[in-house]
């Protein structure tokens, strides 16, 4: 009986792969149904013997309590965008400085939701959303209902793969037809439909909506030599892999593919919003490395944004956390890139003057990066008024005088007690890239502020359940959930806190670099400007901003309150002892390593106290060169920099 159940699971998973992924079924529908019914019958008789990879999980429904956070073992990076051929040429030139003979694999950029799938011994054990790249949401049960995701692999591999989950156009039309018949609001576009479906708490809904996937990356260490090889491996393992791709040896060939796909785009059975261009050889990818947000070996070309005409009705002026006052146009509604747009950014007061935007103008609207609606220009032939837009002289939040500094394009409110700035600052503090307090978004911040429950970030940690129950629409469950999220954030590594404080010019990357150097926020607060300027990639602008921030009495009070509330102020990443072998040394890796992966080599260097840089300069102390080292090695030799090999590093 147990053997028969195992045999049926294996057969049905194989047949499902042939049907959904290869579109080449080897058995008829009736044969499949007969085997499926036999398995269902056996599982009903022997529920304790049901295998986790059973295909019956795909259609069975369960109601989930919610989605837990999922720590990605391997970070998911975003991609640098390109909107013109010139930007692709610049990317190509950067790559060819290091690898003159580089080739590129061009793949379709599917307009869906990024997912990560983890397998242990060939069995799917976890599936998650991208989230902030480090922490996503565990949506394993929902992903098990996506029919072309294999529950088991043909080999007992432990592997993590990445891809895109999307809703085909036909499925999107069917879902919206059903929603229309049921009197429900229709989804704006397939991407929103896919994202909404994967966040359903009722898994049976996911099973009915016919989502699909394309996998494109092996995130765990791989023995493959090229991106082409990776895609072939994924296909052999049973994953859906998009066959519409091309290997290009020149940027001209890349552009030819972009133009060809652009012409065929509307005929595809799924939505795409661009082409992803990747350096094909994985050794070259490792050598080129990453910025804090994106790989240097890939770029995403985005197709030109759709443009529509709309009439300007009015302008709202809103205050951001740094005091910048931004104008937003209220427009007659238009359909743009699958969504209804009635508001669009006007950027700043200088932009309004430059484009000569006036009251009641007809304007061209587009989505910058296919995401943010923005006003592009005026249709002057349809102008009905010569009246200029009213530009405020007072802050719309606190009524303080607005300033327009000579070196800035924006109006700015400099009142530190401005309610809008405080609320925006609180929302930033709780945001995903900062303290990542789930549930503490702008709407909840506004409610807390209105009831005078929170006035600064330390006040967040003074909140209790009773405070949260005062908020509109908050019940015991939602109050407990937010309270627990606040408490959990106390243990974040301090670079998240530093970024969350919203110090001008100090982004997430600078926060990490600073805490790697000074180890905790109190030590950073005592640092001299010269110490900060001496750090590679940081400059005087950041040093002055930090010095000014920490010199304020209010900052010292705030840090003390945070510490007393139990918020961690220390960096929890790798810290090198002051007497470590490479303490304070700037080291560059180049060439192909034989025994260590580049990630392992970098981690070891960090443990030894080194700062690992991506390029060779006069500030470089040491270059570790593997096989086929290129221009970095040549430059190191030219500058007289110490050069060692992988064997030397392994002995340390």
From Swiss-Prot:
Enzyme class: ligase
Names of the cofactor(s): Mg(2+); Mn(2+)
Keyword Ribosomal protein: no
Keyword Magnesium among UniProt keywords: yes
Residues annotated as binding Zn(2+): 395, 398, 413, 418
A Gene Ontology term for the protein's cellular component: cytosol
Reactions listed under catalytic activity: NAD(+) + (deoxyribonucleotide)n-3'-hydroxyl + 5'-phospho-(deoxyribonucleotide)m = (deoxyribonucleotide)n+m + AMP + beta-nicotinamide D-nucleotide
Binding site residues for NAD(+): 29-33, 78-79, 107, 130, 164, 278, 302
Gene3D superfamilies: 5' to 3' exonuclease, C-terminal subdomain, 6.20.10.30, BRCT domain, DNA ligase/mRNA capping enzyme, Helix hairpin bin, Nucleic acid-binding proteins
Family assignment from sequence similarity: Belongs to the NAD-dependent DNA ligase family. LigA subfamily.
Protein known as: DNA ligase
Gene: ligA
């Amino acid at each position: 009986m147990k053997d028969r159940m195992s045999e049926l699971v294996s057969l049905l998973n194989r047949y499902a792969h042939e049907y959904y992924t290869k579109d080449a079924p080897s058995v008829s529908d009736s044969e499949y149904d007969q085997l499926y019914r036999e398995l269902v019958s056996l599982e009903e008789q022997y529920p304790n013997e049901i295998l986790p990879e059973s295909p019956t999980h795909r259609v069975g429904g369960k109601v989930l309590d919610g989605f837990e956070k999922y720590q990605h073992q391997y970070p998911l990076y975003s991609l640098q965008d390109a909107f013109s051929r010139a930007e692709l040429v610049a990317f190509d030139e950067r790559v060819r400085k290091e690898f003159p003979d580089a080739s590129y694999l061009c793949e379709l950029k599917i307009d869906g939701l990024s997912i990560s799938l983890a397998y242990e011994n060939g069995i799917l054990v976890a599936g998650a959303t991208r989230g902030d790249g480090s922490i996503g949401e565990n949506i394993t049960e929902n992903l098990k209902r996506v029919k072309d995701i294999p529950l088991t692999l043909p080999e007992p591999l432990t592997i993590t793969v990445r891809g895109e989950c999307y809703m085909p156009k036909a499925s999107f039309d069917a879902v919206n037809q059903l929603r229309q018949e049921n009197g429900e609001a229709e989804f704006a576009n397939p991407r929103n439909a896919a994202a909404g479906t994967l966040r359903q708490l009722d898994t049976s809904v996911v099973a009915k909506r016919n989502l699909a996937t394309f996998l494109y990356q092996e995130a765990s260490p791989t023995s493959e030599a090229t991106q082409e090889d990776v895609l072939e491996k994924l296909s052999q393992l049973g994953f859906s892999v998009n066959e519409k791709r091309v290997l290009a040896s020149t940027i001209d060939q890349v552009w030819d593919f972009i133009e060809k796909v652009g012409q065929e785009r509307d005929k595809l059975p799924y939505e795409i919003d661009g082409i992803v261009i990747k350096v094909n050889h994985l050794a070259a990818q490792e050598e080129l490395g990453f910025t804090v947000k994106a790989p240097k070996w890939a770029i995403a070309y985005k197709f030109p944004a759709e443009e529509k005409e709309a009439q300007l009705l009015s302008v709202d002026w809103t205050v951001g956390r740094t005091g910048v006052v931004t104008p937003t146009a209220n427009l007659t509604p238009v359909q743009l890139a699958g969504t209804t747009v009635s508001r669009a950014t006007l950027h700043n007061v200088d932009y309004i003057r430059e484009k000569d935007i006036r009251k009641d103008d007809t304007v061209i609207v587009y989505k910058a990066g296919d995401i943010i609606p923005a006003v592009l220009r005026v249709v002057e032939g349809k102008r009905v008024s010569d009246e200029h837009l009213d530009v405020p002289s007072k802050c719309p939040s606190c009524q303080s005088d607005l300033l327009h500094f000579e070196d800035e394009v924006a109006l700015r409110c400099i009142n530190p007690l401005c309610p809008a700035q405080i609320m925006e600052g609180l929302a930033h503090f709780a945001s995903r890239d900062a303290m990542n307090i789930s549930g503490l978004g702008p709407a909840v911040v506004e409610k807390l502020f209105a009831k005078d429950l929170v006035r600064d970030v330390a006040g967040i940690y003074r909140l209790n359940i009773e405070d949260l129950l005062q908020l509109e629409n908050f019940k015991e469950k939602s109050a407990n959930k937010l309270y627990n999220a606040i408490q959990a954030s106390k243990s974040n590594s301090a670079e998240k806190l530093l970024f969350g404080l919203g110090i001008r010019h100090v982004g997430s990357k600078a926060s990490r670099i600073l805490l790697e150097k000074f180890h905790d926020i109190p030590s950073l607060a005592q640092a001299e400007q010269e110490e900060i300027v001496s750090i590679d990639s940081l400059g005087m602008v950041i040093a002055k901003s930090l010095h000014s921030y920490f010199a304020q009495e209010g900052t010292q009070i705030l840090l003390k309150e945070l510490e007393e509330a139990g918020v961690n102020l220390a960096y929890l990443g790798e810290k090198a002892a002051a007497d470590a072998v490479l303490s304070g040394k700037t080291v560059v890796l180049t060439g192909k390593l034989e025994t260590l992966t580049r990630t392992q080599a970098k981690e070891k260097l960090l443990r030894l106290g080194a700062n690992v840089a991506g390029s060779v300069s006069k500030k470089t102390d040491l270059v570790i060169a593997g096989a086929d080292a290129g221009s970095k090695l040549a430059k190191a030799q030219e500058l007289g920099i110490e050069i060692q090999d992988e064997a030397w590093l392994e002995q340390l």
